[in-house]
């Protein structure tokens, strides 16, 4: 800065530093001629000070006032942790009776059947399901067991119900051949529904489904991976070996590592396994894979599918922060026609598993809590989904004692590590489905 244009406060400070030097010289002069000053009646000592000292006082006061009037920058508010909520649900099985209940005369309105539980999906920042079956041609009637095809509009109906994405790798992935697999992904893309586990190219197979969640000024990037155990003996597309992710722990870890290197804050793995169905405990293969993923330090959450009944929720040692990896060995069915008539009573119910994901100001991501909500199918009311509590479910056609028993079955299996959630979550965040590489 040009010294001839210093601010007034800087000038005042300079005057304050120079003034004492003038005062000392005058004191010395007054001492030398003091006697003469008395004789002539002139207070020579004082007069120079009378012209300068008051100026100094005024300048100091002005400087003080100037310093006091300068605005003081407010301390920025410290950043607070931001909590995101992720919910995982079970198998979407569009059995023919379910599809018939969804038919409104023009289309298959599955979202109407799911409406009673939609708040429990929409209130989460990210909702992930398992699409058990491929979709058929537009306008084609659905098919059921053993070679499934869901109505083409099913993915759009899942979005209306509150889902953000689904795993698509299962033992039914190629029920409609490779063409059906591709059609399923195209229908997901058209609906804006995320998908992972099946692919149309090697590049897509190697790409996780990413979700970017914005909330309270922060962004959380979630990577979703999915794998299945077999294809029910159907032929694997020989010219498209990358079309389905089959269970391979080493590859899961490799893709999880790549996802983190590419910026994922949270890695979720959907694991469709194993041979047995309708059992309420995990098989050894599930346990081994879960422990391997936890030990890798790359996976935050593992979600199990295929058993069609709920299985335990556990917090395993390991995980990215060393504070553990959550595993829900089985989420049961989300929507289906299964019941005691074909299977076991527990197949009429499922669980929505919630995870609290905390993003700290320093950028660290942890998953300190898990919770669950029991759901069931009210077949007597046209396959409408219901949230059930220890008191049953208000408005259901299924007898309340049956609903209370189903809730008890879910609670007993899931265990006590996760707490029960009886109210829907809420969020003011936004979630973006990032298109997978192709």
Predicted features along the sequence, with ranges:
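Acidic, metal/ion-coordinating pockets
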Residues: 2-17, 23-438
């Amino acid at each position: 800065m040009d010294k001839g244009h210093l601010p007034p406060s800087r000038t005042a400070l300079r005057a304050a530093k120079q003034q004492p030097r003038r005062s000392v010289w005058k004191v010395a002069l007054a001492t030398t001629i003091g006697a003469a000053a008395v004789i002539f009646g002139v207070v020579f000592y004082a007069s120079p000070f009378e012209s300068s000292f008051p100026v100094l006082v005024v300048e100091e006061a002005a400087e003080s006032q100037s310093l006091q009037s300068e605005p003081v920058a407010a301390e920025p508010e410290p950043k607070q942790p931001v909590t995101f909520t992720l919910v995982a649900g079970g198998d979407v099985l569009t059995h023919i009776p379910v599809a018939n209940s969804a038919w409104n005369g023009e289309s298959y309105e599955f979202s109407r059947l799911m409406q009673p539980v939609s708040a429990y999906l929409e209130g989460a920042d990210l909702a992930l399901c398992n699409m058990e079956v491929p979709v058929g041609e537009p306008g084609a009637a659905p098919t059921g067991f053993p070679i499934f095809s869901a109505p083409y509009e099913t993915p759009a109906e899942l979005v209306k119900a509150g889902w953000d994405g689904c795993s698509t790798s299962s033992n039914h992935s190629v029920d409609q051949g490779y063409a059906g697999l591709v059609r399923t992904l195209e229908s997901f893309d058209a609906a804006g529904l995320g998908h992972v586990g099946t692919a149309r190219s090697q590049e897509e197979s190697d790409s996780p489904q990413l979700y970017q969640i914005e909330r309270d000024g922060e962004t959380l990037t979630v990577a979703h991976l999915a794998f299945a155990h077999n294809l029910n003996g159907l032929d694997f597309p020989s010219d498209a070996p990358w079309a389905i992710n089959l269970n391979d722990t080493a590859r899961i870890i490799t893709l999880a590592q790549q996802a983190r290197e590419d910026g994922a804050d949270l890695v979720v793995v959907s694991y469709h396994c194993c041979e047995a169905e309708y059992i309420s405990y995990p098989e050894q293969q599930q346990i081994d894979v879960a422990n391997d993923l936890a030990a890798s330090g790359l996976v935050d959450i593992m979600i199990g599918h295929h058993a069609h009944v709920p299985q335990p929720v556990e917090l395993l040692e390991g995980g990215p922060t060393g504070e553990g990896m959550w595993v829900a060995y089985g989420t049961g069915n989300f929507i289906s026609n299964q019941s005691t008539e074909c299977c076991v009573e527990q197949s009429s119910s499922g669980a929505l598993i919630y995870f609290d994901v905390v993003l700290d100001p320093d950028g660290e991501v942890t998953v300190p809590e898990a919770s669950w909500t029991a759901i069931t199918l009210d077949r007597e009311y046209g396959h409408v989904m219901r949230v059930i509590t220890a008191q049953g479910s208000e408005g259901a056609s299924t007898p309340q004692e049956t609903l209370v028993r189903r809730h008890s079955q879910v609670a007993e299996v899931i265990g006590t590590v996760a707490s029960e959630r009886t109210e829907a979550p809420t969020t003011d965040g936004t979630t973006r489905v990032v298109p997978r590489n192709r």
